[in-house]
Amino acid sequence: MKAVLLVVAALFLAGSQARHFWQQDDPKTSWDVVKEFANKYVDAVKESGKGYVEQLDASSLGQQLNLRLSDNWDTLSTILTKLQADFGLATQEFWDTLEKETEWLKQIVSEDLQDVKHKVQPYLENFQKKVQEEVERYREKVRPLGIELRDGARQKLQELQEKLTPLGEDLRDRTREHVDVLRTQLAPFSEEMRQRLAKRLEELKDSATLADYHAKASEHLKMLGEKAKPALEDLRQGLLPVLENLKASILSSIDQASKQLAAQ
């Protein structure tokens, strides 16, 4: 299972570079995506949690029990922020290590893409040339009709449209033929690229780097757990005043209710 996860992660990193190679864009790094998602999630939890606490304090039950949960919310929020930062640093180390370990795979895939692009380029240029020739051919046939339209009377408009229709259909059909030819020509290169990627994945799975990375990943997970312990302990300590306050309020309410029943 770990091997599958690492292979998928390697493909994700290599795929990001391949997409950048073809599209010439500037994609976010894997760490940026994870960090942005984690920050938004924790911020949403803190914001919504604060709203729920304020609503509970303002409710009739909260006022009756004198919960005052809002008094402890800032402390809990600070602990959550610290926990977020601790996890963030550890996770960034993991992504940096993973990207470094798979740099050779990204380089090989980039070279494969460059090779396939070089082979495909003549077919793309030929396709563009053929389409351009068809467009020019269409223009040459249409040009006399345009002159005829300008020089002729309005009643000839319908006749002109009837002449244009088959020419447009002919251009469409001939362009489709060129597209089919291009698709047939590019099919072997698509299969070649698929086989190359499969080969690179097999090399990755059989390499000593993957086995070594298994050990590093296990060590990292253990380290992550150790780093999380202090933050979780702080969170537990921050919750204790809230729980004690809640417990005292409930016991006080029960005591008052018992006294009222005894007085009756």
UniProtKB/Swiss-Prot annotation:
This is Apolipoprotein A-I. It comes from Cavia aperea (Brazilian guinea pig). The modification Methionine sulfoxide is found at M193. Pfam families: Apolipoprotein. GO terms for biological process: acylglycerol homeostasis; cholesterol efflux; cholesterol metabolic process; lipoprotein metabolic process; phospholipid efflux. Sequence repeats lie at residues 67-88, 89-110, 111-121, 122-143, 144-165, 166-187, 188-207, 208-229, 230-240, 241-264. Participates in the reverse transport of cholesterol from tissues to the liver for excretion by promoting cholesterol efflux from tissues and by acting as a cofactor for the lecithin cholesterol acyltransferase (LCAT). As part of the SPAP complex, activates spermatozoa motility. Residues 1-18 form the signal peptide. The gene is APOA1. InterPro entries: ApoA_E, Apolipoprotein_A1/A4/E. One of its GO terms (cellular component) is chylomicron. Residues 67-264 are annotated as: 10 X approximate tandem repeats. GO terms for molecular function: cholesterol transfer activity; phosphatidylcholine-sterol O-acyltransferase activator activity; phospholipid binding; protein homodimerization activity.
